[in-house]
Amino acid sequence: MRVIVNGEAREIASERVDALLSELEYEGSNFAIAVNYDVLPKSRWAETALKPGDEIEIITPRQGG
């Protein structure tokens, strides 16, 4: 299905947030996920279904000053 990930249109096979993270090779838990501007707690990643056209933001911490 076609979704937007971090502002970029992508064709993905995943149907849930947790599967998308695996598909995109994100590991660990040092990031936050928002679907259609709704930040999801990690406890909901496995149950949150994705739909065509969803906008997903994967937010990772950055070091800087």
Regions inferred by a protein language model and the residue ranges of each:
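Ubiquitin-like/PB1-type beta-grasp interaction modules and other compact soluble beta-rich domains
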Residues: 1-64
